[in-house]
Amino acid sequence: MSKTGQQIEDDIYVFVKNSQLASLINGGVYKFGTRQRDSNNEDAIVKFVTGYNTQNPLQSGTVVINIYVPDIDQLDNGVLVRDITRCTEIEIAANDWVESLTANKSNYLFEMAQTIYTEEEPEINQHFVSIRLKFKLTTF
């Protein structure tokens, strides 16, 4: 039986929540739309993006995990900038986590949809590490 987008997001949320990646960040893991607006923590947001019922019992699609990192006042001059060191640490850990995802741990097969990178979120003085994954799901 095919899964819905929310069911897939729920599955990925559990994978992230129970990962070493979650223990690396100082915030929480949230499903899309549930992170507190004023959070200044390193929070991971899991979002289902697209899904296709390609061939029964196979589904495929894309999910994204964004890990927010608060900007820092690096020069003590009141100007907030990207915490390059921390973003790099999280990018490397995220890459290691993605490489550890194997089909023998679940019915999902993952591959990176694009290189893991950091993007600016200027309205909240934070940046986020973006992990975009393609998935294939076997539903028996």
Per-region residue spans from a language model:
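Charged, amphipathic alpha-helical segments and their flanking helix caps
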Residues: 1-26, 48-140
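Intrinsically disordered, low-complexity, compositionally biased regions/tails
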Residues: 9, 31-32, 37, 65
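N-terminal, polar/charged subdomain of small-to-medium soluble alpha/beta proteins
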Residues: 28-35, 41-43, 86
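Short secondary-structure boundary/capping segments within folded domains
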Residues: 35-40, 53-57
